[in-house]
A protein has these predicted regions:
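Helix-adjacent hinge/juxtasegments
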Residues: 50-74, 78
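Active-site neighborhoods of divalent-metal-dependent phosphate/nucleic-acid chemistry enzymes
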Residues: 75-117
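A generic structural signal for short hydrophobic patches within well-formed alpha-helices
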Residues: 11, 44, 126-127
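Acidic, PIN/NYN-like endoribonuclease modules and their adjacent C-terminal/linker elements
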Residues: 1, 108-109, 113-135
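Short, well-structured N-terminal submotif of metal-dependent ribonuclease cores
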Residues: 1-39, 54-64
Length: 135
């Protein structure tokens, strides 16, 4: 295992000590420290959007958290493109019976492209697509 993909739900749990998955996110830290990590701009946007109504203090903490990720050489942050959007829209359209968000679809496509099978999340949508979730 060389790389793990970080989903929004992992970051949400990591940032907020009151999150029900916070302890799981902390406990997996030794594994996280031993590998390179990948996420997408869409995941970071989703994280910032989620905390946008949590008040000034939390908005500042999340913004600081994201800025640290951007500077961390262990993190690869895959940028947005028209092709990634359209490819994700294809997956979204092909899974109309699922509750996948477009961000999930982008993440799944990135994981497939980069041969990443393990996801830091508790989102079972990833399991439905054959990925192993680690929270």
């Amino acid at each position: 295992m060389n790389r793990l993909f970080c989903d929004t739900l992992y970051f949400t749990a990591l940032v907020n000590p009151k999150d029900q998955w916070h302890q799981s996110a902390i406990e997996i830290e030794p594994l996280v420290e031993s590998v390179d990590l990948v996420t997408t701009e869409e995941v970071l946007i989703e994280l910032l959007n989620f905390y946008s109504e949590f008040g000034k203090r939390m908005r500042f903490e999340v913004s600081t958290f994201v800025r640290k990720l951007l500077l961390n050489p262990k993190f690869e942050i895959v940028g947005r493109s028209e092709i990634s959007f359209l490819d994700a829209l294809e997956l979204y359209d092909s899974r109309l019976d699922k509750g996948y968000s477009l961000t999930d679809c982008i993440s799944m496509n990135v994981c497939r492209e980069l041969n990443i099978n393990e996801i830091l999340t508790h989102d079972h949508h990833f399991e439905q697509e054959g990925f192993k979730i680690l929270l």
